[in-house]
A protein has these predicted regions:
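TRNA-recognition modules of translation machinery and tRNA-sensing kinases, especially anticodon-binding
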Residues: 1-118
Length: 118
């Protein structure tokens, strides 16, 4: 969320229902940012909790007061890079075709605006 807040992109957090969970997932959160061309939100980040589903198959355990227990695991997509680039372009594109660079990225881009070629 912090990344999307710094980029000032419209977003929301979705708690997925049981029918949308994949094999072994116990709980899943998605962060979706607005795509103006599609008039809908699209996933940019995902975080899933698997309890011990994956670690049982991998035999990843820890010892708790002498008792072996399986660890619990998470699976996360830190950022869907191609999609977030599209969302930045779409949300920051101006009527003349230029693209404002989000403030948080200006130091890395070395400019404030990407202009169209004339």
């Amino acid at each position: 969320e912090e990344l999307l807040q710094k980029l000032k992109l419209p977003y929301h957090v979705v708690v997925n229902c049981g029918g949308d969970l994949g094999l072994g997932q116990v709980k899943k959160y998605d962060i979706e940012a607005w795509m103006p061309s599609e008039k809908r939100y699209r996933e940019t980040h995902s975080s899933s909790y698997f309890h011990d589903f994956q670690t049982r198959r991998l035999n990843i355990r820890y010892r708790d007061n002498g008792t072996l227990k399986f660890v619990h695991s998470l699976n996360n997509t830190a950022l869907a890079t191609p999609r977030i680039l599209c969302q930045i372009v779409e949300n920051y594109q101006q009527e003349d075709g230029s693209i404002l660079i989000p403030e948080a990225l200006r130091a890395y881009m070395g400019k404030d605006v990407i202009r169209t070629l004339s």
